[in-house]
């Protein structure tokens, strides 16, 4: 299967979960390009991934902040995984951060796993950092921005739940966020506004992903 044909309708294919990675030694061998999604707990990360590939229940959603503490790998189904028949890319759902009253050892383990992955994964093409439109960039997000800058990984801000605020407030938030990103050398300048519930901004996000892995 050629790369161009594998990208045709990739977001409409059936997607499957292939692996949870609790520690860096469990990472799959480097293969296709990887796109990672990061964000605070309950930012709507799982819902956005599910909406992106039009498949409810692929990435598990939870009302319990910090439930998932692994790197979860998803790929489109129908590829053998052998040389010449790799999926066009993999989606990596990173653990949520910023949950209240987290034990220090859990935070340290999360930080070590994430930084090791970011710094050492040559197939990682971009991290999409999700920010809740109702709250903007918070202190925990700033810490992750610094981590991404330190790892020198390309990342892009995706605003979630943008249907929950008025259009003028969203425009103001985008301007404020763009100004903040001027201090972050690894940040991609364009900000994407999305809503999983209303399917808003999903086509723009899909296009951005395909452009990133092209």
From Swiss-Prot:
Residues annotated as domain EngB-type G: 31-214
Keywords of this entry: Cell cycle, Cell division, GTP-binding, Magnesium, Metal-binding, Nucleotide-binding, Septation
Cofactor: Mg(2+)
Any Gene Ontology biological process: division septum assembly
Keyword Magnesium included in the entry's annotation: yes
Residues bound to GTP: 39-46, 66-70, 93-96, 160-163, 194-196
PROSITE patterns: G_ENGB (PS51706)
GO molecular function annotations of the record: GTP binding; metal ion binding
Binding residue positions for Mg(2+): 46, 68
GO CC terms: cytosol
Lineage: superkingdom: Bacteria
Primary role: Necessary for normal cell division and for the maintenance of normal septation.
NCBIfam families (alphabetical): GTPase_YsxC
PANTHER family xrefs: ENGB-TYPE G DOMAIN-CONTAINING PROTEIN, MSS1/TRME-RELATED GTP-BINDING PROTEIN
Protein family membership: Belongs to the TRAFAC class TrmE-Era-EngA-EngB-Septin-like GTPase superfamily. EngB GTPase family.
Protein name per the record: Probable GTP-binding protein EngB
Organism whose genome encodes this protein: Bartonella tribocorum (strain CIP 105476 / IBS 506)
